[in-house]
A protein has these predicted regions:
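Alpha-helical transmembrane segments of multi-pass small-molecule/ion transporters
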Residues: 1-66, 71-296, 300-352
């Protein structure tokens, strides 16, 4: 079982940025000195989807979906204001602010360092991040801010279902504005492979295990068997992505920093929008904090998967999504501290 620190965040999760940096280095070295490995793996693809990458991405996403109790949606009518904050922030505001901020930096502020064709792909990667609100990691951020666990489950479950219908048209719309060709069939196939399949598998697994062993066994024993699987899948995926990106990164190491700047600014902006909206609505802190965290963080596993399917493992779009992984944990931990230090802004907790 994955070791947890006293802060409530798992050891691997707490130091995820370190592991990501190490995987980046390992991937770049493989791409530079063992180029035959990524070239060999690149042979195995179907409908523009890399089979090895698909397997690793399923390893990332399936364990997350087992944790989500979709039965919780029956409680959607309880304190709906918190859900409205989450939904509006995630689907009406966030994708478009991400597009605007990324376009401003990649095409205007950083135009002296980023060629137009690279800027276009970096923008595509940013859009994919902005259109996919976080799922599993929200439970970590909710725990660290003493969020209402039952309400957090409802927030996550409803967003997972909205992804099924909103992700494709939003991505298509925003990338279309930038004249980025995105085939509908590949985009829909990506969502089917990397959301519908693991989501369905997770729901079926929950149902089967609960019927056979009960909810207590599922929550306390079965889910624990998958601790670390998502992290391992993510890290191996990053090794492969950076193996394909090795030459590009060695030529343009500054680009990692340039990509990170708008992604970090977007994270703080979206958190503040959701968090201050929750304050204006006088929501309790244990609902307000997770609402801010869901919008601020990204479903980066999905973003990486779709970027690879649409643009290829060695694309600049895939690189941009992986930079999102690199910045996620340290930035979110800062937001956790901000939330906990402003807890007094909000009414008393909804929990007993």
């Amino acid at each position: 079982m994955e070791t947890e620190t006293k802060s409530g965040i798992g050891f691997f999760q707490k130091y995820l940025t370190v592991w990501v940096a190490l995987c980046m280095a390992a991937g770049v070295l493989i791409g530079k000195f063992l180029p035959g490995i990524p070239q060999f793996l690149n042979r195995f693809e179907y409908a523009k989807v890399s089979i090895p990458m698909a397997i690793l991405i399923w390893l990332m996403i399936y364990p997350m979906m087992i944790k989500v109790d979709f039965q919780s949606i029956k409680d959607v009518g309880k304190n709906p204001k918190g859900l409205f904050v989450t939904w509006i922030t995630n689907w009406v505001i966030k994708p478009f602010t991400m597009y605007g901020i990324a376009a401003l930096f990649f095409f205007v502020i950083f135009k002296a360092w980023i060629a137009p064709e690279l800027a276009t792909e970096y923008l595509a990667g940013a859009v994919l991040l902005g259109a996919a609100p976080c799922t599993a990691m929200v439970f970590v951020w909710s725990t660290l801010t003493h969020g209402n666990p039952a309400y957090t489950v409802v927030q996550v479950a409803t967003n997972d279902l909205i992804i099924l219908v909103a992700f494709v048209p939003i991505v298509k719309l925003l990338l279309g504005v930038s004249n980025i060709a995105v085939p509908w069939d590949t985009l829909i196939l990506s969502v089917a492979l990397f959301v519908v399949v693991p989501l369905t598998a997770g729901m079926l697994t929950r149902t089967f295990v609960i019927r056979k062993k009960g909810v207590e066994y599922l929550e306390n024993t079965f889910i624990g068997k998958f601790n670390g699987v998502t992290t391992v899948g993510l890290l191996l995926t990053l090794v492969l992505v950076f193996a394909f990106q090795g030459e590009t990164i060695l030529k343009n190491p500054l680009h990692i920093v340039l990509i990170a700047v708008p992604l970090i600014l977007q994270t703080f902006l979206i958190f503040l929008i959701a968090y201050l909206a929750a304050r204006a609505l006088k929501l309790p802190f244990d609902i307000a904090a997770p609402a801010g965290m869901i919008g601020a963080s990204n479903f980066f596993e999905l973003a990486v998967a779709v970027a690879i399917a649409l643009f290829g493992t060695s694309s600049a779009a895939a690189l941009a999504t992986t930079v999102g992984v690199l910045t996620e944990v340290p930035v979110m931990l800062v937001l956790v501290k901000i939330a906990n230090s402003t807890k007094h802004w909000f009414p008393e907790s909804t929990q007993n």
